[in-house]
């Protein structure tokens, strides 16, 4: 009578860690293999993450104080009243693209102080 793979797996699952370690050692000797050589790294150690240097400022919602948001947009983008109003009313919209992190943060603060919801992407 031979054991199935499932029966072997159940038997191993019931073993202690010490017994499993001994079993692995015995299998390595019997079959002439090493479990150390079979370990495959899951990610490359030389992986580097590039820091983003250009950001887009997106007006997502104008909030309750529409007039203050229009004034803030006019001030930071140098638009006329009608153009700023049309731009604000078409939210969500990208106000500025490819700007520095500091400039994006400053623009976000100005617009949020006026009552708008802003995202930096």
Curated annotation (Swiss-Prot):
Q: Does the keyword Ribosomal protein apply?
A: yes
Q: Which Pfam families match?
A: Ribosomal_L12, Ribosomal_L12_N
Q: Which residues cross the membrane?
A: none
A GO molecular function assigned to this protein is: structural constituent of ribosome
Q: Which UniProt keywords apply?
A: Ribonucleoprotein, Ribosomal protein
List the GO terms this entry assigns under cellular component, sorted alphabetically: cytosolic large ribosomal subunit
Which Gene3D superfamilies does the UniProt record give?
3.30.1390.10, Single helix bin
Extract the InterPro entries matched here. Ribosomal_bL12, Ribosomal_bL12_C, Ribosomal_bL12_C/ClpS-like, Ribosomal_bL12_oligo, Ribosomal_bL12_oligo_N_sf
GO aspect biological process, one term: translation
Q: Which PANTHER family match?
A: 39S RIBOSOMAL PROTEIN L12, LARGE RIBOSOMAL SUBUNIT PROTEIN BL12M
As for what it does, the entry says: Forms part of the ribosomal stalk which helps the ribosome interact with GTP-bound translation factors. Is thus essential for accurate translation.
| Subunit comment | Homodimer. Part of the ribosomal stalk of the 50S ribosomal subunit. Forms a multimeric L10(L12)X complex, where L10 forms an elongated spine to which 2 to 4 L12 dimers bind in a sequential fashion. Binds GTP-bound translation factors.
User: Per the similarity annotation, which family is this?
Assistant: Belongs to the bacterial ribosomal protein bL12 family.
Give the protein name, as stated in the record. Large ribosomal subunit protein bL12
Ranked from the top, the taxonomy reads:
Bacteria, Pseudomonadati, Pseudomonadota, Gammaproteobacteria, Candidatus Palibaumannia
